[in-house]
């Protein structure tokens, strides 16, 4: 399978057996991103790593021959997923028409319809040639737990959006790249 990332990870399968195996795994671990971190020579025993926007996840061993799965260890058993906030995918247009993707994390109990007049932290990623991804971030969860909405945006130049998007950032530091951040703030308001 080939792996790529949009707002969450996605896979393209080259054979029906791999696809069927992964679909079985996904049904059992719904709501989590799943990575295959190891596999035996016969490719029927897999080591899996899960995570989500609310948890660092766990490791599992999966035997595809008998469809048995066993949890090996929770990565962060002290984190209660029920106390964490959802990381929502968002998209907006920059002032020059470029689509900018990102994430909005709202305090628990809020959604896009009822989140009005919340304090907001605008949290652009470093780099600039990096990106924000869907997954657990303790800093973001801390801020949401304290009542802040947190906006993360993948401004022009962020990786994973193709060559044209990447090159649109050349010689644009402090200019269009900054405008993308400002435009995200205006979109949120």
Walk through the language-model features, giving the residues of each.
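Short loop/turn segments immediately following the C-termini of beta-strands
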Residues: 4-5, 51
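Structural motif
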Residues: 8-22, 55-60
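A short helix->beta-strand "capping" segment at the edge of beta-propeller domains
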Residues: 19-31
